[in-house]
Amino acid sequence: MDFTSSQSQNITDEIFHSGDFFPDIHALDYQKSMLTDGKLTPERLKHAITTAIIEINRELSAWRQSQIEKGYASMDKIPAEFVNTESELVLLYRRAVYSQTKANLTERYRDVDTTNSGEKKAEGLGTTIDELWRDVQWAIQRIKGESHNIVELI
């Protein structure tokens, strides 16, 4: 599914503060990284990013607390590998927030167009959504230092 559009809803570079421990999230960076649909309004994006930050921060709350107890006041102070001058932990956090934001927006996109072609598009989005949720879980597990094996019992 193509999520690019020549239209733009004038997404401003709003900065979402993720608390004192986690890095801030920039709306324009999200939009550039995740190839958002031009129909995305600033209000929808704000809601989706805010919700994703809340959920990811809750998932990582015990890990965050253990890092603070070790003396690390913020994620970027934790010893980690660096990629392009940024901590891999910060990059993984961003991936988790961006993927959850996009998964939530994509899930809601499916119910917008109820025509036959819209129904076929919606069916095709299932795989994309599953991959985004997988990316969220893998990023969270990597931040926690866990492997990203997911086992399903039959």
Residue ranges with predicted function:
Residues 31-36, 78-86, 121-125:
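Charged, low-complexity surface segments at secondary-structure and domain boundaries
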